Amino acid sequence: MRIHDLDPENRPRERFLRTGPASLSPSELLALVLRSGTRNNNIIDTCNALIARFGLERLADIPLSELQEIKGIGQAKAMQIIAVFELNKRIHYSRNLQRKVLSARDVFEYMAGRVPDITKEHLFVLHLNTKNQIIRNEQVTVGTLNASLAHPREVFKSAIRESAHAIILVHNHPSGDVEPSNADRQVTEILRQAGSFLQIDLLDHVIIGVDTWFSFREHSLLT
């Protein structure tokens, strides 16, 4: 069944105009973005298939080639999907750029949706001003954290350029287990010492998982 075959009152566009976007399902909202299906694929069914395969939460991180594996999703529609989620990320980033960080929970909430590929380990450095507001968020490395990847030169280079008062390290564990490894501890200590020499405080190192986090400061591992 095509959208035009539906009762007019039940079509996504008409319901949107009548009752607002909150009344539509995720598939219906996505259908409004993609607008039309193909001769053999209802756009609602196509959007249902997308969400069933990838899940709504993961849809923002699926690459172009994988989106096109869904019947009815060509390159143009896959680009539309990625563009919508990318725009949302940038809006979220802009709103939170000078967010004040007072705890590891603040860091965890700030980083929600900012890890581009949760199947890989990423190291980010948050630059803070004297009011503990984030003035920059920089991705430094991709891959298992170790001393060669997280060299003080790379970590502090932009912090010096931005005249940051302090930094917070953030990295994710793809496994979801946020317990720090020996390498995590060693890298943190090396960077703490480097920050002390440069007079740029390392306020915390926060390891994030899917729904939890580990704070070096809260566990008294930064002295």
Curated annotation (Swiss-Prot):
UniProt keyword terms in alphabetical order: Hydrolase, Metal-binding, Metalloprotease, Protease, Zinc
Molecular function GO terms recorded: metal ion binding; metallopeptidase activity
Gene Ontology annotations of biological process type: proteolysis
Basic and acidic residues composition-biased segments: 1-17
Region (Disordered): 1-20
Motif (JAMM motif): 171-184
Domain of life, per lineage: Bacteria
Domain MPN: 100-222
Database matches in InterPro entries: MPN, RadC_JAB, RuvA_2-like, UPF0758, UPF0758_CS, UPF0758_N
Sites where the protein binds Zn(2+): 171, 173, 184
Pfam families, per database record: RadC (PF04002), UPF0758_N (PF20582)
Protein family according to the UniProt entry: Belongs to the UPF0758 family.
Protein known as: UPF0758 protein Cpha266_1761
Originating species: Chlorobium phaeobacteroides (strain DSM 266 / SMG 266 / 2430)
